[in-house]
Amino acid sequence: VRHPGIWIIAVSSAFVYITQHAVSEWGVLFLQKGKGFSLAGATQIIAFSEAFGIAGTVLAGWLSDKVFRGNRFVPVLISGLLCLLSLGAFLFTAGGYSLNIIYVSVFSLAIGVVYCTVAGLMALDIVPRKATGAALGVVGLASYAAAGVQNIVSGVMIGENDFNFAPVSVFWIVSCLLCFLIPLVSWKSLRRR
């Protein structure tokens, strides 16, 4: 895969996976230790995250093709900002059960749109048809490797700070910001050759 845009997409997708897996894999612990929810309540809140993530991936293609007429950057910007704002609200505000469901639902819907648009649609747009499998393989490899690294880094940060989630929350927020900023500032490299 020689197109430099695929490597940009792979890095962006890696940050998507860091962000998404942070919520899906550490969200229950965060809700319990950071916000005082019971295990049952925390698990129920995070369950909404998974359902809305699926809806976001379904919504991505329709938004990109029908609403924005093939412009991939507008849905990435809008959903990226929604993702960042809802993640910030989830991590840095109190809120009860219902409000936290709204935070994770909006976050997951938005991150689903970012992921599907960047890692799927943009990647397929810029490579020749014969290279799509290799391109998506590179993106997938970077994504899953980053998710694994995120688990290690997050676990160390949470453990080292005695369940003070402020430092790891900054890591997650910065990853969220990078997941949509990277393709937006690299738009010239994300054109078909």
Residue ranges of model-derived segments:
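A membrane-interface helix-boundary motif in multi-pass transporters
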Residues: N71-V74, V153-C176
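C-terminal ends and interior cores of transmembrane alpha-helices
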Residues: L81-G95
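A late C-terminal transmembrane helix in Major Facilitator Superfamily
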Residues: R129-N161
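Transmembrane alpha-helical segments of major facilitator superfamily
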Residues: I45-G53, V139, S143, S175
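Multi-pass alpha-helical transporter architecture, strongest
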Residues: F90-F92, V170-R193
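Extracytoplasmic gate region of multi-pass secondary transporters
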Residues: H3-A60, Y115, A119-G120, V149-S154
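Hydrophobic core of transmembrane alpha-helices in multi-pass small-molecule transporters
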Residues: Y97-A119
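Cytoplasmic membrane-interface "Motif A"-like loop-to-helix N-cap segments
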Residues: D65-G80
